[in-house]
């Protein structure tokens, strides 16, 4: 069914369950219950009693994000004035919506780029993001993938480039 979310895992040798390492969204039974509804409303429920471990979520036929800014051009590298931030520490509510609400303040500082410390999935909920797992998934602790796209779109509308810190060589643990 188009737009419906489905959870799945790979079952290996009849007893090892793994989420898809290329998953754009996961369910984590140990950490998702600590994410508030204001940050990640209507989360897909974890299939308690049916499996264990991290579950991949896919949504075939999902509506693509409708970008307001489709022609953004980033500043030349030599002209970048970058503000690096960690969503969790920069705004008290630690979510993309509150970050969007502070973009005018950041713009007044004279910057033209925001560098996000790694926003991808990482183990637990409290981290700088330098312990990544599931490199294609954004960590739900900061908000939904749609809200992240809205953040990028809002930055571009103000002339701000968005740089995402990625640390593939730091992967460990559940990765």
Where are these regions (language model features)?
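Short, flexible loop/turn elements at secondary-structure junctions
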Residues: 86-91, 120, 139, 168
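Aromatic- and acidic-residue-enriched segments that line the glycan-binding/catalytic groove
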Residues: 22-41, 126-138, 170-175
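Aromatic-lined carbohydrate-binding/catalytic grooves of carbohydrate-active enzymes
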Residues: 105-147, 160, 171-172
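Hydrophobic faces of well-ordered beta-strands that scaffold small-molecule active sites
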Residues: 81-85, 114-116, 162-164
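Alpha-helical scaffolding segments of alpha/beta enzyme cores, especially the outer helices
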Residues: 101, 150-153
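The feature marks proteins involved in alpha-glucan
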Residues: 2-80
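N-terminal small/glycine-rich loop or linker at the start of catalytic domains
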Residues: 74-90, 131
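Short, acidic/polar
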Residues: 93-106
């Amino acid at each position: 069914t188009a737009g419906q979310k489905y959870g799945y895992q790979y079952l290996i040798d009849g007893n090892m369950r793994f989420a898809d390492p290329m998953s754009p969204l996961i369910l984590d039974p140990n950490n998702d219950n600590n994410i508030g509804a204001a940050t990640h409303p209507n989360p897909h429920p974890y299939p308690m009693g049916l499996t264990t471990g991290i579950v991949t979520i896919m949504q075939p036929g999902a509506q693509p994000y409708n970008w307001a800014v489709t022609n953004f051009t980033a500043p030349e590298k030599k002209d970048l004035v970058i503000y690096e931030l960690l969503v969790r520490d920069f705004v008290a509510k630690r979510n993309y919506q509150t970050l969007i609400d502070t973009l005018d303040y950041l713009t007044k500082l004279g910057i033209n780029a925001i560098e996000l410390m790694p926003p991808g999935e990482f183990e637990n909920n409290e981290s700088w993001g330098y312990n990544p797992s599931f490199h294609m998934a954004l960590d739900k602790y900061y908000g939904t993938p749609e809200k992240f796209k809205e953040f990028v779109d809002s930055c571009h509308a103000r002339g701000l480039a968005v740089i995402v810190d990625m640390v593939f060589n730091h992967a460990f643990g559940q990765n």
